[in-house]
Every structure is written in structure tokens, then in C-alpha cells.
């Protein structure tokens, strides 16, 4: 039994780390801006109670309207964490056979054998065959 990492493992791990780092950076930036804005408004004497209540209502409305987007992003996060496939892997997904060219949080692009570039929402990927993983 050979447990050594295969060729390209370091590049694949670096790509995953870069993507996950980008997600965490975006989340942290959003949190910092929201907290800073709330603190500045509080210093100017604004009553933040109604603002927070309104933000909650807007959050529910946006959440209901963006269910597909949220599903795609969550699927992308789990796909990255579970390392289901990566750039350069040969995959069969939906009715497409080809090579993964880009993996994003929302969309994965696959170059089909006939040369067509397919953009697949991560939330649509229910089953996937990865010929590159042994």
C-alpha cells in the first residue's frame, strides 16, 4: 500500500488553500465593514435598533430570493473541503465528459471533449465521476 501523495498534489492543495483563503478574506472584510459602520453610526447618535431590525427583514428577503446562489456557494465550499475534484481532473458530470479548467465557489468550468467550455453551477452537480482519482 503506497500512501505517498500523487503527482500534482501540492499544486491542488495550494489551489484549494487559495480559494478557501479568498472566501475567508471576503467574509472577514464584510464583517469588519459592517461592524465599523455600526460603530460610526452609533458615535453620531443614530439609534441602531431600527437599523438592525430592518437589516434582519432585508436579510430574510434576500435569503429567500437568493436560495439558488446560496446553494451553489455552499455546494462549492463543501466540494473544496471534500476535495471531490480539481483543476485538470477528467470528469463526467451531468451529460458532459471533459477536463476541469476552473473551480470556483459558485461555478465550475469544464472543457468538453469536443472543445465546448461548459459553465456548471455547483448546486447542479448532484453526481460526478472523477477519472483522475484512483
Each language-model region and where it sits:
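Soluble accessory domains appended to multi-pass membrane transport proteins
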Residues: 78-134
